Structure formats: C-alpha cells, structure tokens
Amino acid sequence: ISKLVNTDLDFEMLQSLLVGNSVEFYDEDEKIKPGIDNCQYTLGTIRKKKLRKVMEKGKELKEPAQSIYMIPETFKIARILFYEFGPDRSFDAIYSEYELKDSTQLFPMKMNYTIKAQKTVKIDLVYSKIVLNEEQTFPFKIPENYEAISIKEKK
C-alpha cells in the first residue's frame, strides 16, 4: 500500500483507516480549510473549488491534498480523500453503515477503499461482528525439548 500511495504508512495510520478515524498526511504547519459539501462538513488542505477542478478536469496539483468529509449529525468520518502529484493518483476511503457498539461508540461497518496509481485497486470491507476493548490472549506452550537461542544484533 505504501508504494501505491507514495507515502510511509505506519501501524497507527493503517489502523485509523480500517476503523474510520482521521489520518493526516499533510504538513503540520499547513492551514486546514473548513467547508460544507453535499450536506457534509469538510476539512481540507485545499479549497473545494480547486479540488473540483482537479477531479473534473484532470488538472495536476502542485502539492498533495487531503479532504475529510464528516456526517453533520455525528461528526463521524464519511470519506477521506488524498490526492497526490500527477493525474489519477489518489486514495479514497468511504465509510458507511455506522452502528452503535458497547452503547458508547459509533463504528463503520462498511468501508470502500480505492487506490489509483498506475493501476486501480478497490477494496470493499464489511464487518459482521465487532467487539471493542476486549482483552486478547495468545495461549501457547513452549515444548520441553525447546532450546533457546540468542540472536545477535548487527551493528
């Protein structure tokens, strides 16, 4: 995925994308511009008008752009859109079918991801069951005939 979107993805970024949380690829010093588009709140690194020109006319961006679309009633993320330099280089994540889990947290049960680069990759993800904040165990036994080895670090 990192090669397709031309950025370093760490575990926290990937986890955020899988559960519908915000992911920021923009420069921390960059100003975020608020707006409203199709009855959703938006936050983006470029104005809506400029983004539409890029989307409709295939113009190239001078810098990467990010837009986040939020559902007004819940302020949950409906869509995260990243545009990269060059035509047809983008990452689009759409979150839908939010359900209340543990009577405290809204969680997207359906996600659609589209990565456009030299090739287009589409991933549709639907959760059937989600359990939050449950402690995980990994039970295993080490065989008696196991001999421990030590690994030396390379310098």
For each of these PLM feature ranges, what is it?
Residues 1-15:
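Acidic/charged, solvent-exposed loop-and-adjacent secondary-structure segments enriched in E/D, K/R, S/T
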Residues 20-21:
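Scaffold/interface architecture of coatomer-like assemblies
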Residues 26-27, 31:
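Phosphate-interacting basic helix/loop segments used at nucleotide- and nucleic-acid interfaces
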Residues 32-144:
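Gly/Pro-enriched, hydrophobic low-complexity segments
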